[in-house]
């Protein structure tokens, strides 16, 4: 037999050595991302795509079989490339030939850096280790790289390195097979002709690769030689052909574990020992040492979102009697209680009556979803009774949301049956009262209610608390206070109406929707039972609802009108002027829903206009009872609840800062959602900063035009400049804390008196449609309005920012408690990640920093915002977009 006809081979199961693979070169071009992709994903600029030379790529290899990895991946060592990617490196795979199954394949992925500690796949290729005849691959192979994905190691791989999908790849595959046949001695070897042939094959392959849209990775499988002879590696498994009987039925033996669903006895015992339930009375005399006292003070100072460890909970319980003198410690103590243990709950409620009364602001936390014990919630309501109407109004929006965490049956039981059907079901009694459950919630007040009997007095508590202070649940408290104050009644009505009409809640949580309907029914009953002034209040609320319904009907008629904005304006004014049809130009005085202290008696038709926007909101001038004018914006087709929340928080922050003798000249204009689709906004006479810069050239020119002063700074009235500086500082800090996004010069407004304020809060809590937004909206033009970064006014601005930030940090618990009550509200940016809402606000306060560190942090934020170059580019892009829109 001739030498060329002899085939030498070795079984794979006899090779107890590791598999090796050589990574050669990568050929082809990478497609560079567009600038739009960089704007959408800024981290791309750190990837190798944007290097002038070849980027520092690396390759990972991993062996798979039956879609599962056989070993950990290995990677090429670091190598810097200049003109081409060429590793030329042998990799030792952590698997031996003897351990390879017939279906083994190697997955090769090429990686590029992508920012700190991150990498993205350039492409991947997968190739089987054994050929179709069971021969281990040998020699050089060009593998097709599938771009932008990792190599797929599954059986039906999505990244095959060897394909026959095109004519060019057919040519390369044919030449590869001929080269393999030559290497195995199936062709006569002629040295001079072989050199020419292999050079021509290499040129053809290079040409085919260049004309292809794919990249190709060259790999080399080792050749086995012994005594100068080449050996092929043939897959073979000893006793692999023998049949092995297997059972078709399940052999799994299930052993029941009776303790699986039971509580851990050790943990229960530890809990009881740590809580010392038997030695409860002796804990009264326990006093902490200095170190323990410091630890308790740290625990008490934790923000509301901080979860206490089991050790911290045991420590608070141990010194509970000592902590009764600290009102701030009550919420931490109540979080430590296991309410499922009757004895522990009893002790906790006994202590609740002895605890130093907590502040009204802190009691809001007890109304969140974390506290379900009815006595604890009634204690929080008892603390709220100490708040005056003005403070209660600041929290009313959140208190209406807190009704979702009350006992719905208790709320329903407060409904009073009619005399006629007092023994019948509640549903029937409501129907007899004219309030059918299917009736629109807005009609509840307009339906007359019959006389009703007084409800039974509340039962007395046995938990050591004064029963008189725990009479009312939250619903009863809100209704009773609203019946005594027309302003509270106004806002309670509209806040509850919006919840009643929320179709998302009705579909997703019908029980909550029914609860709000019951609240509205109880409110209506309470108003009807009151004296004459309270019944008048009920009548005015019903009239308000009718007025809003007519206004919505008017706006829909205008929106249906064909033609441009001018024609729609004319239609709006014509409909308003037709008092017989619409009854909007002249009517009996009623409280304005947006601000009930203002009594309105009609709309001035000739002053009504529509704004330039998709929904075309209307600017309306109301005639007030005292002969004045009150401008508002009425939006139909827009959910104002997010704006309403942010303006409420801004108004609260303004009040808190004024309490600290810091007036930052804020403009918390009023917003009221009268439905999920329409509402009112107070109109403030002002000019967008973008328009100021376009018409006057600068903010200072605008001030000099309307408030000139020879003695003032830069020829501007000192009072106006002071107002501008303070309002800039206030809104910079507040919008930073609330994470307000989409800030541009069109939603920053300026008044002639120097007040700067923000509008349009469609993006909050860190959301922003623009890439790389600065921490706060503070651009070059705003700083130049103060006189530049070296001016005295700019330094005053920075100091005001530091002072405002420190003051608001001290009230962080109140602000966080208010947001915690809003997590289940259908507010768009809260509904996206409700579980992270409070954490997002808390992170902005940086409560982990001392006051001095917080000032340095704010300094850095201001400097970063002023020097943000990308924000200036985005502002110019927005400016051009607005220009082309017009």
Swiss-Prot record:
Q: Where is the composition biased (Low complexity)?
A: 445-454
InterPro entries tied to this protein? ARM-type_fold, C2_domain_sf, Kinase-like_dom_sf, PI3/4_kinase_cat_dom, PI3/4_kinase_cat_sf, PI3/4_kinase_CS, PI3K-type_C2_dom, PI3K_accessory_dom
Q: Where is the segment annotated Disordered?
A: 414-464
Catalyzed reaction equations: a 1,2-diacyl-sn-glycero-3-phospho-(1D-myo-inositol) + ATP = a 1,2-diacyl-sn-glycero-3-phospho-(1D-myo-inositol-3-phosphate) + ADP + H(+)
**Subunit composition and interactions:** Component of the PI3K (PI3KC3/PI3K-III/class III phosphatidylinositol 3-kinase) complex the core of which is composed of the catalytic subunit pik3c3, the regulatory subunit pik3r4 and becn1 associating with additional regulatory/auxiliary subunits to form alternative complex forms.
User: What does the similarity note say?
Assistant: Belongs to the PI3/PI4-kinase family.
Q: What is this protein called?
A: Phosphatidylinositol 3-kinase catalytic subunit type 3
Organism in which the protein naturally occurs: Xenopus laevis (African clawed frog)
For this protein's source organism, the top of the classification is: Eukaryota, Metazoa, Chordata, Craniata, Vertebrata
